[in-house]
Each structure stands twice: as C-alpha cells, then as structure tokens.
Amino acid sequence: VLNTGSPITVPVGRVGLTGLTVAEHFRFTQANSEVSALLGRIPSAVGYQPTLATDLGGLQER
C-alpha cells in the first residue's frame, strides 16, 4: 500500500494492473486497425475500427 499523504491509501498492485489492462485494450484496438489496413480494408475515414465505440464502451462498463 502506497501512502500518498492523503487520507486514502492506494494499493500499488491494483494501480499497476489497471494501467496494464488499459494499455492492452488499446494495443488490441490498434492491432485490429493494422490488420484491416494490411487486408486492404479502410475501417473509416479516420482510421479507427467501426466497433471502436462498442469495444471501449465494454471496457468502461467494467
């Protein structure tokens, strides 16, 4: 547990794992975009997958 000087202490392991999980979700999304580009499919005008909003919505619900 990390004492930040505030009344709330933050468990160090959870913070690191949360950051790692978020990073992995974004890597997955980026990999989907790269695969679409390699296959010659344009997902959208800005380059993101059409399911990006759904994927990130599922992440936010967790």
UniProtKB/Swiss-Prot annotation:
One Gene Ontology term from the biological process aspect of the record: proton motive force-driven mitochondrial ATP synthesis
Induction context: By E.ampelina infection.
Main location per the UniProt record: mitochondrion
Cysteine-cysteine disulfides: none
Protein name: ATP synthase subunit beta, mitochondrial
Catalytic activity: ATP + H2O + 4 H(+)(in) = ADP + phosphate + 5 H(+)(out)
EC number: 7.1.2.2
Keyword tags: ATP synthesis, ATP-binding, CF(1), Hydrogen ion transport, Ion transport, Membrane, Mitochondrion, Mitochondrion inner membrane, Nucleotide-binding, Translocase, Transport
Gene Ontology molecular functions: ATP binding; proton-transporting ATP synthase activity, rotational mechanism
Membership in a protein family: Belongs to the ATPase alpha/beta chains family.
Entry GO terms, CC: mitochondrial inner membrane; proton-transporting ATP synthase complex
Assembly notes: F-type ATPases have 2 components, CF(1) - the catalytic core - and CF(0) - the membrane proton channel. CF(1) has five subunits: alpha(3), beta(3), gamma(1), delta(1), epsilon(1). CF(0) has three main subunits: a, b and c.
First-tier enzyme category under EC: translocase
Functional description taken from the UniProt entry: Mitochondrial membrane ATP synthase (F(1)F(0) ATP synthase or Complex V) produces ATP from ADP in the presence of a proton gradient across the membrane which is generated by electron transport complexes of the respiratory chain. F-type ATPases consist of two structural domains, F(1) - containing the extramembraneous catalytic core, and F(0) - containing the membrane proton channel, linked together by a central stalk and a peripheral stalk. During catalysis, ATP synthesis in the catalytic domain of F(1) is coupled via a rotary mechanism of the central stalk subunits to proton translocation.
Compartments reported by the entry: Mitochondrion; Mitochondrion inner membrane
